[in-house]
Regions:
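N-terminal beta-strand motif that seeds the catalytic metal site of vicinal oxygen chelate
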Residues: 1-16, 62, 119-123
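Core segments of cupin and vicinal oxygen chelate
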Residues: 7-47
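Vicinal oxygen chelate
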Residues: 11-13, 63-108
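A short linear hydrophobic-aromatic micro-motif
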Residues: 27-29, 50, 86-90
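Long, continuous compositionally biased terminal/linker segments
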Residues: 39-81
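Short beta->alpha transition motifs characteristic of CBS
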Residues: 97-98, 104, 115-122
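Glycine-rich acetyl-CoA-binding "A-motif" of GNAT/NAT acetyltransferases
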Residues: 112
Length: 123
């Protein structure tokens, strides 16, 4: 089981503000910050998604599980409003499996951030 992940960002403050807004609909909040160097987000009390000031040498793809399709849509809307770029609007992705519902947004550094729900739509 993965405990946490870290992602390099070129502009730390800009990325903190982006992730505070983009991840809020998923229940994530800024839990820990180290003076302009690193910040940890997650569902309290434990951060599991970290960003750190550094060179962005390659882009990563991170998927965060959502509790339902509405939460996926809320993530997408919040991330776009926070300055993210569309990389796949909310929708079913049957090539993964019949209930895979995800949305993809690139952050200010081009990292592909996804919210995903694996549950069938119940109406």
């Amino acid at each position: 089981m993965i405990d946490h992940i870290g992602v390099s960002v070129s502009d730390f403050e800009r990325s903190v503000e982006f992730y505070k807004k983009a991840l809020a609909p998923l229940g994530y909040e800024l839990i820990k910050s180290f003076a302009g160097v690193a910040a940890g987000f997650g569902v309290a009390p434990k951060p599991d998604f970290w960003i750190g000031k550094g060179d962005v040498k390659q882009h990563v793809h991170v998927a965060i599980r959502a509790s339902g399709r509405a939460q996926v849509r809320a993530f997408y809307e919040a991330a776009i409003a926070a300055g993210g770029k569309d990389n796949g609007a909310p929708g079913v992705r049957p090539h993964y499996h019949e209930h895979y519902y995800g949305a993809f947004v690139t952050d200010p550094d081009g990292h592909n951030i996804e919210a995903v729900c694996h549950e069938p739509f119940l109406g």
